[in-house]
A protein has these predicted regions:
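Catalytic phosphate/nucleotide-handling subdomain of diverse soluble enzymes
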Residues: 1, 79-164
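Conserved ATP-utilizing enzyme core subdomain
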Residues: 1-78, 162-173
């Protein structure tokens, strides 16, 4: 964003034209988070510009070509997402996985996930579900299950020891 004065890399075009910086990718892949068992979740609270700059500085790459850094970050994301997928899915038994959210707009990222996971990657748009609405739909389903007093978790996904009813209902004023 900073180097190109853009909000995002549309379809991963800038990253697609970059080259992986092997030592940067190897160093980032050593982050302890990636070896934690699922379930897990993270985001900008850990992985932000300062995190990338710290790795670049440690490798004396503070002046690396921005497109090469982007390419390395796309590969980092594709590898770690693919590794996580493979812990819960046998690629030989799955026809496709479906992406939603902001990453679903990055065609290059989806291609790299498909290559690394050996599973076709499509977007939820192909299922008639807007990629920007999937999270809202999921939370609506959680709420429906709560109202119906039915469990809404899967032990193999959440790591819970048993199925349980999620959330709470409170009386309004």
């Amino acid at each position: 964003q900073d180097s190109y004065q853009l909000k995002y890399d549309e379809n991963g075009a800038l990253a697609r034209n970059g080259q992986i910086i092997p030592e940067l990718l190897a160093r980032m892949l050593q982050d302890p988070y990636f070896s934690l068992a699922a379930p897990k979740s993270t985001g900008k609270e850990i992985y932000h510009l300062a995190w990338v700059q710290q790795h670049l500085q440690a490798l004396n790459l503070a002046h690396a070509v921005a497109g090469d850094v982007l390419r390395s970050l796309v590969e980092l994301t594709a590898i770690t997402v693919s590794d996580a997928i493979k812990t819960v899915i046998n690629p030989a038994l799955v026809e496709a996985i479906y992406a939603c959210g902001g990453g679903a707009y990055n065609q290059f990222l989806l291609e790299r996930i498909a290559e690394n996971s050996q599973i076709k990657v499509r977007t939820t748009q192909e299922l008639g579900i807007d990629v920007d609405q999937m999270e809202a739909i999921a939370f609506a389903w959680f709420a429906k299950r709560r109202v119906e007093k039915l469990p809404a978790n899967y032990e193999t996904v959440t790591g819970a020891s048993q199925k349980c009813i999620l959330g709470a209902l409170y009386a309004g004023k």
